[in-house]
Amino acid sequence: MIKLRMPAGGERYIDGKSVYKLYLMIKQHMNGKYDVIKYNWCMRVSDAAYQKRRDKYFFQKLSEKYKLKELALIFISNLVANQDAWIGDISDADALVFYREYIGRLKQIKFKFEEDIRNIYYFSKKVEVSAFKEIFEYNPKVQSSYIFKLLQSNIISFETFILLDSFLNIIDKHDEQTDNLVWNNYSIKLKAYRKILNIDSQKAKNVFIETVKSCKY
């Protein structure tokens, strides 16, 4: 249902400078300033620029411990959560626990998606919307939407939001209706994350329909 688009040769080790380039690419990608897919996971960085970095120690240590695929997942998992995450923070134990939780979430994506859909459905009953579709629609009066608030509150995951977007077009519809700064910051990250995911939108839609049906009975 969902699969990451990763750099080629993921089972190899890379040097410290290459780890820095990978980190920089993903960080700029998540901030909407670069496109790792368009440029095929390539970026030019001079040796001089890398040597000037006071934090190159962290990149070197990571290069000795993790393969390319693992590094990409570590950076993606942490930069999805925080676009401005510093390499020193990403290198600590908490960040690595976060990475392992992210891997677990991806492996159980169907279960997590169904769980989030049920939470959305029960939330819709709690707030007493006149129609279930209102949960996914932008409300100009409050400059937000229920589905966005659920994402902000960590009730649903970024993966669930993007799976829903694959057949409901939530992100683009919100973009058309608002230039709200808070939404814009999330929109940049969501669209960047969406680019590095291969999604089976029909399967996501089928799971959504079946899960909502099961909640009604």
UniProtKB/Swiss-Prot annotation:
Tell me what happens on changing residue 217 to A.
Impaired interaction with SSB
**Entry keyword annotation includes Repeat:** no
* Reported effect, residue 207 to A: Impaired DNA-binding
Q: Name one GO biological process term.
A: bidirectional double-stranded viral DNA replication
Q: Which GO molecular function terms does the record list?
A: DNA binding
What, per the annotation, is the impact of changing residue 27 to E?
A: Impaired DNA-binding
- Say if the entry is tagged with keyword DNA damage: no
Q: Which UniProt keywords apply?
A: DNA replication, DNA-binding, Viral DNA replication
Which family does the entry's similarity section mention? Belongs to the Tequatrovirus DNA helicase assembly protein family.
What does the annotation say about its assembly with partners? Monomer. Homohexamer; when associated with DNA. Interacts (via C-terminus) with the DnaB-like replicative helicase (via C-terminus); this interaction brings about the rapid assembly of the helicase onto ssDNA. Interacts (via C-terminus) with the single-stranded DNA-binding protein; a ternary complex between the helicase assembly protein, the single-stranded DNA-binding protein and ssDNA is an obligatory intermediate in the helicase loading mechanism. Interacts with the viral DNA polymerase. Binds to single and double-stranded DNA.
Its biological function?
DNA helicase loader protein that participates in viral DNA replication, recombination, and repair. At the fork, required for loading of the replicative helicase onto DNA protected by the ssDNA-binding protein. Coordinates simultaneous synthesis of leading- and lagging-strands.
Q: What is this protein called?
A: DNA helicase assembly protein
Species whose genome carries this gene = Enterobacteria phage T4 (Bacteriophage T4)
